[in-house]
């Protein structure tokens, strides 16, 4: 998922805020989310280390959607990350929808929280270097 961090840096510019809210992701199942994004003309899909990543730059599905590979312990699962204004600053919001076992889903969410924190550190380092 290292490539995801690099590509997400270009998409998000701020301190991360974490919110796991599977109801707010807008779909009842991971399969429904995937099917809807496949129909979205604004969705750009790529495969990164077995993960299906959909980048949607505008519209109701706006954000970066990361779908677990079939071999992932939390599969089927999707993590949606998107920018949101919180307290006057742009932050990374995150929503998860996971059909796998709870412990694996919890680990998946923690993994993405760490990725978000790394993005924030990378951005702060870039700001400090200017």
Language-model segments: residues:
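Positively charged n-region of N-terminal signal peptides that target proteins for export
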Residues: 1-4
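N-terminal signal peptide c-region/cleavage motif recognized by signal peptidases
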Residues: 14-16
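N-terminal secretory signal peptides
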Residues: 19-77
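Short, surface-exposed coil-to-beta transition loops
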Residues: 73-80, 91-93
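A short, surface-exposed beta-strand/turn
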Residues: 79-89, 116
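Acidic/histidine-rich, surface-exposed loop or edge segments in extracytoplasmic proteins
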Residues: 86-99
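C-terminal partner/receptor-binding element of secreted or periplasmic proteins
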Residues: 97-130
């Amino acid at each position: 998922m290292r490539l995801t961090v690099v590509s997400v840096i270009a998409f998000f510019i701020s301190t991360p805020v974490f919110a796991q809210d599977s109801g707010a992701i807008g779909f009842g199942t991971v399969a429904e989310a995937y099917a809807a994004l496949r129909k979205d003309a604004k969705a750009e899909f790529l495969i990164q280390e077995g993960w299906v990543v959909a980048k949607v730059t505008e519209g109701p599905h706006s954000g970066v959607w990361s779908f677990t590979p079939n071999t992932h312990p939390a599969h089927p699962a999707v993590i949606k990350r998107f920018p949101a204004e919180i307290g006057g600053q742009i932050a990374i919001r995150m929503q998860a929808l996971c059909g796998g076992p709870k412990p694996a889903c919890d680990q998946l969410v923690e993994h993405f929280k760490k990725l978000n924190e790394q993005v924030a550190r990378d951005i702060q380092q870039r700001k400090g270097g200017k």
